[in-house]
Amino acid sequence: MKELTDKSILNHTPMMQQYWQIKAQHSDVLLFYRMGDFYELFYEDAKLASQLIDISLTKRGFSAGEPIPMAGIPYHALDSYLAKLVALGKSVAICEQVGEPTINKGPVERRVVRIVTPGTLSDEVLLNERQDNLLAAMLQDKQGFGYATLDITSGRFIVSEPKDFEAMAAELQRTNPAELLYPDTQHNLALIEHRRGLRRRPIWEFELDTACQQLMIQFGTSSLKGFGIECAHLALRAAGCLLQYAKDTQRTAMPHISTITLERQEDYVVMDAATMRNLELTHNLSGGIEHTLVAVLDHTVTSMGSRMLKRWLQMPTKHLTTIENRQQSIYFLQGKFDILQPILRKIGDLERILARLALRSARPRDLARIRNALQQLPDIQSLLADNTSGMHLSQLLSNVGYFDNLCQLLERAIVISPSALLRDGGIIATGYNLELDELRALANNATDYLDILEMKERKHTGLETLKIGFNAVHGYFIQLSREQSHRAPKRYIRRQTLKHVERYIIPELKEYEDKVITSKSKALSLEKKLYDALLDMLLPYLTQLQLSATALAELDVLSNLAERADTLHYVCPMINNQPIINIIDGRHPVVEPLMSKPFIANTLSLSDQNHMIIITGPNMGGKSTYMRQNALIVLLAYIGSFVPASQAIIGPIDRIFTRIGAADDLVSGRSTFMVEMTETANILHNATCQSLVLMDEIGRGTSTYDGLSLAWACAESLASRIKAMTLFATHYFELTTLPNKIKGIVNAHFAAIEYNDTIAFMHSIQNGAANKSYGLSVASLAGIPRDVIKCASRKLHELENLSNNIALTTPLSSRSLPQFTQETSPVIQALQEIDPDSLSPRQALDLLYSLKQMI
């Protein structure tokens, strides 16, 4: 936008002077300028909007000697166009006519009433109902980072102080803010430069004293000590900037933001950005939601429950009491979920409705939904009255409450199915206000009055074609046919002439018309006052209602987990203080439901005596699935969920790390190997003896010597220095000698059987190292031409005859070369490789199914 001086503004028309004065205060956003029944955009805003939302670009006369580019939308279509612009990361200032048009010269008074930005949305049509929409602020200095997030649709205000780049990256990955504020003095933008919704803010908005003052005013306190954040200076500075921005955009009080929480890393099982991505918790590696843990686990019946479940998955708790409370509640609800879930479904998104109530932007149907939600509470209390699961569920029910008086008020005040918008009327129920009933009766009884008047006039004039009608342009009228119009009495005043009829008005009908129109206008005005008064009556209950909504969301999550445990045959894990991960017959929670045949369960046993497993075996043999499934089982256990296994005992876990798969980071200019090494470095710097670490094929992105050396050194460091609980998958068979050199390491492998040109994967983990990698067999299965496979086989034979120092794999005897012409039965070969003493009953049964399919 071109800069305008005070003097140059005076060259414009009065209306455009007003526009420029308002636009100067909101130069960085699109200005929707209300003119009658339209929102208009001018100049550069009009040009940009016409491109972004495909509306016509035209001109609105001249001002200051230049044509005025203009584009506009109907006022009733505002929400749909806002949704498009916000999805594109744009912010919009809504400028309304707040004054009354008068006979005085000059434009009607206008004022920006709110600014819609990606991080401050509250209207349901603009939001993804099952995903948090966060506004965030970030600040960095030598001590680390300050980070604050606000969900304006719930009032959830959270701060943290990530200690380094990796921790901050993990927070951004987890929270995925729709809008991110950062100081204009921050020059290193590597962490955020490719994120959406970036907003530069002046550094003075991050000033500590101002931030503390802002927060104390918001919470109505004289100190921040009660929130436990008074020493978190970086977090406070970020929170202060964020709160000021929210106030600037909302232009109204925000009473639902009544507390602030400092999140500490030691309270949660920490997962870095790579781990959350690789485990595909909420999004798959392609960015979609199919085949993710959430896709399997989220059968919640309310949107607020769905959002809470995602927060649990992204921040598993380390508090054993919380975990045990959830487990006990799930166990109890396994006998109730089929009745409870249909009731909870009627609750709706109470959390976000209450935010709109707090912002005074609640629409009539929001109040109807609050009423409908409150009507379900007695049924919930009655159903769970026999709770035997302990104090946690009892406390949840106490927080849910009853709200009988509030429910009765809304039942009396709001019609069953109110209109969508207040301006359409028909919201306040009959009987709630006597004056409103009388005004409505005057308008609604028009038919009876007009029927009587029509009969009276027809009798008085003797004109059989006389009718009384109404249209929006001319109002009420008496209509006569053209043939009888010449007999109209003198008191009939012609109002409209049509081809076959004449229309008239008489003083009595005109007087009644004025009375009806006035009554409708008065009724609508009174209805608005009653509605505003109703909001005032609801606001004192806001804190209690928010507490109830949070409890209802948790009930939804717990009943959902109870249903999932029952349907998917999950068991309750035991969480204890011993250094152990013992999972019997574990199953992958995402892969298992996708399979048409039984999933082959596998066992994991890690402890302080055996804290690393070197896993070998062919590609597609099940190594990655096995590692991911165990990480997901541990994660599920730490959110309090039941898990897919026949038994699980899990000790203290402080972090989960994954180094699984990689691709070039083209945006940052990092190769696959560089990505792999960066993630590995993070693990080696931050893992502890209580961490679960998954390492898949470290070193494959470089030369054999380099890769093997790095893999060896990483495994040695994890096993002997860090002593982390580690699953280490590799194709470097040299690593299988590590158990002979370092205490705490054991070998395991996934078996496969070759037969002619095919390979059969057993998908069952067994003790000991694999005897070969089966690379050529897998290549053949993938469709590599037969002559290429034969050439590769010859080359492999040559390489195996070289010294061990240059071998690409563990040297194999000539008889262990790929047997593409072998005629031995695959069933016999499989039986030869099986160690029956190492198989659990479940594994033996699964193996039997696999052998039967090979016959």
UniProtKB/Swiss-Prot annotation:
Superkingdom, taxonomy of origin: Bacteria
Binding residues for ATP: G617, P618, N619, M620, G621, G622, K623, S624
Gene3D superfamilies registered for this protein in UniProt: 1.10.1420.10, 6.10.140.430, DNA repair protein MutS, domain I, MutS, connector domain, P-loop containing nucleotide triphosphate hydrolases
GO cellular component, one term: cytosol
Annotated keywords: ATP-binding, DNA damage, DNA repair, DNA-binding, Nucleotide-binding
GO molecular function, one term: ATP binding
GO biological process, one term: mismatch repair
Annotated CDD domains: ABC_MutS1
PANTHER family in alphabetical order: DNA MISMATCH REPAIR PROTEIN MSH1, MITOCHONDRIAL (PTHR11361:SF34), DNA MISMATCH REPAIR PROTEIN MUTS FAMILY MEMBER (PTHR11361)
Xref: HAMAP family: MutS
Family in the record: Belongs to the DNA mismatch repair MutS family.
Function: This protein is involved in the repair of mismatches in DNA. It is possible that it carries out the mismatch recognition step. This protein has a weak ATPase activity.
Protein name listed in UniProt: DNA mismatch repair protein MutS
